Design a protein with these regions (language model features):
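Sec-dependent N-terminal signal peptides
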Residues: 4-13
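Intrinsically disordered, low-complexity terminal tails and linkers in eukaryotic proteins, enriched
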Residues: 18-88, 108-174
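Mature extracytoplasmic domains of secretory-pathway proteins
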Residues: 93-95, 100-106
């Protein structure tokens, strides 16, 4: 397991080291019973294989924001229940039939990292809720954050923090 994580970290390092631009960035691990936990932590978990996704009580991820819109419009766009798809235990809303069709062609390209939990929280081994209007796209991957300060902190050492968050995610759910 340790060797696998080392290889994963090195692969992530190489992938991010050959990076391009970062879009969307301005020029205690929680488990078991969550009753009474910090209000920033989601209280609803949905199994998706061996992983968890951050959804509301109806199973909707990212509070209904359109994951394709982050990539095509470079902004958070509210989706509609009229256009929806379920993928790996979460329901995704889209702002248009075109975005829904795009998602269905390659869902893994658009899903948020760390199941939609705050990337900075995951860096610290915490499952913190996210605000879907606070996001970045790094190397073609969507990251969401609890608030703008978390996003800023995560991007102070982006490569290092992605590697650490990836490691923590695999420790929790793999």
């Amino acid at each position: 397991m340790k060797h696998t994580l080392t290889v994963l970290a090195l692969c992530t390092l190489v992938a991010h080291a050959s990076s391009g631009a970062v879009r969307g960035v301005p020029s205690d691990r929680v488990g078991g019973d969550l009753k009474g936990s910090h209000p920033g932590y989601m209280r609803v978990w949905v199994e998706k294989g061996a992983r968890k996704v951050n959804v509301d009580s109806t199973g909707v991820i990212l509070k209904g924001y359109d994951v394709v819109g982050y990539f095509t419009q470079d902004k958070a766009v509210k989706g509609s229940p009229k256009y929806q798809a379920t993928y790996q235990g979460a329901t995704y809303y889209f702002s248009s039939a075109a975005d829904l069709a795009t998602f269905k062609k390659d869902p893994s390209k658009y899903v948020p990292q760390y199941g939609g939990y705050c990337a900075n929280g995951m860096k610290n081994s915490k499952l913190a809720d996210s605000d879907p209007t606070v996001f970045s796209i790094v190397k073609g991957k969507l990251y969401v954050y609890e608030h703008s300060a978390a996003k800023k902190e995560f991007h102070t050492h982006s490569l290092e923090h992605v590697i650490k968050a990836d490691h923590n995610w695999y420790q929790m759910f793999e």
